[in-house]
């Protein structure tokens, strides 16, 4: 459902999100990574964050389930973007960090424990995992997209058997203009 939306609206989504300033979120993530870390941008969307990480000198591998968004992102960042879902993605090497900004929220709640465990298997020991969800404890379908909202308690349930431990959570307002009344749960997780 959500993939079809992004395939049909890739250019509009790219235009609406590529200039959103998420540096305040990245500033909680990047200082905790080794120099020249390899980051997985999981569900990279427009490629905005991949491009920023590359500009910071990090190695970045990106994927998205939407083939149209992946093509737009690949053009934007100047390197390939793999087309696959979270649980389809595999890689020969482990990552220092995983960045899943506003992407895991499209995974049904029933599949998130397995999805977190799969992604955790791609991290190096003590690897860092950032994720963000619309804040709440419910699921909804809106504008042709499925959303899994998440609060602190729900996140703990999703990661309980994943090999990840919670380092910190914080709430923010939506960074896109006109959405200041929407709240997000941000989390930093560590692989045990």
Give short role names for the model-derived ranges.
Residues 164-175:
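Conserved S-adenosyl-L-methionine
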Residues 87-98:
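A short acidic, Gly/Pro-enriched loop at the edge of an enzyme's catalytic core
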Residues 1-34, 36-45:
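Conserved class I S-adenosyl-L-methionine
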Residues 126-133:
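Conserved beta-strand signature within the Rossmann-like core of class I S-adenosyl-L-methionine
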Residues 139-154:
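Acceptor-substrate binding/catalytic loop of class I
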Residues 46-88:
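Class I SAM-dependent methyltransferase SAM/SAH-binding core
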């Amino acid at each position: 459902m959500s993939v079809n939306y992004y395939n049909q609206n890739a250019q509009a989504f790219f235009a609406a999100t590529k200039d959103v300033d998420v540096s305040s979120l990245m500033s909680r993530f990047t200082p905790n990574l080794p120099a020249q870390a390899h980051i997985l941008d999981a569900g990279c969307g427009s490629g905005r964050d991949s491009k920023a990480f590359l500009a910071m000198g990090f190695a970045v591998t990106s994927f998205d389930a939407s083939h149209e968004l992946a093509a737009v992102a690949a053009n934007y960042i100047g390197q390939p973007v793999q087309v696959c879902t979270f649980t389809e993605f595999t890689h020969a090497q482990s990552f220092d960090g995983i960045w899943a900004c506003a992407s895991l929220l499209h995974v049904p709640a029933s599949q998130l424990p397995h999805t977190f465990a799969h992604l955790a298997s791609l991290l190096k020991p003590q690897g860092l995992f950032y994720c963000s969800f619309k804040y709440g404890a419910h699921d909804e379908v809106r504008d042709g997209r499925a959303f899994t909202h998440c609060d602190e308690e729900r996140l703990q349930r999703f990661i309980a058997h994943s090999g990840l431990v919670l380092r910190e959570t914080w709430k923010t307002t939506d960074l896109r203009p006109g959405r200041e009344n929407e709240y997000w749960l941000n989390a930093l997780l560590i692989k045990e």
